[in-house]
Amino acid sequence: MEHSRQTMLSFLARLPEQEIVRSRDQGEWSVKDVLAHCVAWEAEATRRLQLVARGQGQRIHYYDDMREADRFNANAVRKARARGFSALVREAARVRQRLIKSLRRLPPRALQDPTHRFPVVAWLPEFAWIHEQAHLKEMRAWWSAQKPVWKPGSGVKRS
C-alpha cells in the first residue's frame, strides 16, 4: 500500500500544476479529481476497518447500485475542488496512514471473517491499491498522449 501511494505521488510531482487541475479527455475529471476520488474510497475503507475492529462489520454499507457509487464519487470530487492540490496531497498521506494503522490493528482472523457480507480481503485490495494503480495507469497513458515527443534526427516535436 505504501508503494502504490508513493508511485502515484511521484507521478503527480512530475506534472505541471496547470495539468493537474485541468479536466482530462476521460470524462470531466482532472488528475486532482482522480486523486480525490481515490482518497475518498480509502477513507471509506478506513471507516469499514474501524467498524470491523469494533465488531460492527454488519454496519458496513456496500454500494451495490452504481448510481450510489457515482453519487459518492461526485461528492468526493466536489469537496476536493474547493481545496488546493497541496492540501489534497497532504490529506492523501494522512488517509493512507490511517488506513494502514487501522489495518494493522485488526487481528488476522478479522480479515477473513465470514460474518460480514464480504470479508475484508474481498474488498480492501481494490479500495487501497488496485484502484489507485488502475487510475495511475490511465493517467500515465493520458499524460503520454499530451507530451510532445522529440524524434531523433527529425528536428520536429510532435504532440
Language-model features: where?
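Aromatic-acidic/polar surface patches that form glycan- and anion
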Residues: 1, 27, 88, 92, ...
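Long, hydrophobic N-terminal alpha-helical segment
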Residues: 1-3, 7-19, 26
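Acidic/histidine-rich alpha-helical segments that form the ligand environment
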Residues: 4, 68-110
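Alpha-helical packing segments of well-folded alpha/beta enzyme cores
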Residues: 4-8, 41, 45, 88-99, ...
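Short acidic/polar alpha-helix capping motifs at helix-coil junctions
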Residues: 10-14, 63-65, 74-75
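Residues that form generic nucleotide/phosphate-binding pockets
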Residues: 11, 52, 79, 91, ...
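Short, contiguous alpha-helical
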Residues: 21-71, 105-159
